[in-house]
Amino acid sequence: MIRIALASQTDIAGWREAARKLLLAGVIPARVEFNIGTETLFDEGDPIPPPGDRTPVISKELLGDIQTALLHSDPERFALAYRIVFRAQTQPKIHQNPADPDMHILRALAKSVRRDIHKMHAFVRFRKVGERGD
């Protein structure tokens, strides 16, 4: 098992870097576990194998959905995203399949995040401390 330690709940850059290395090495999703926070002595997993001759390719649309979904609080979001990008290497149009179960979950996570962002913009108002509100 390869264990990837991400710095925080929203460490998208760390996930992207790890996912790129894993894809280059051809590591299957079942061998990867993503964790939040620092590793301990007992969390040490297998090292990432050396890269092969592949070049990972992901559509901009899929990458946008993944980046939004990674902001969700679902504990399996990082594993789901890696599973999808791994599959996208052999199924480049996976993001266009509305019946794909992984894409259905990813889109639901992204939709939830977008809805929360909208609610924050629409309903949360800030004012300076010390000013009297209406």
Can you describe what each PLM-predicted range is?
Residues 1-134:
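Extended, well-ordered protein cores
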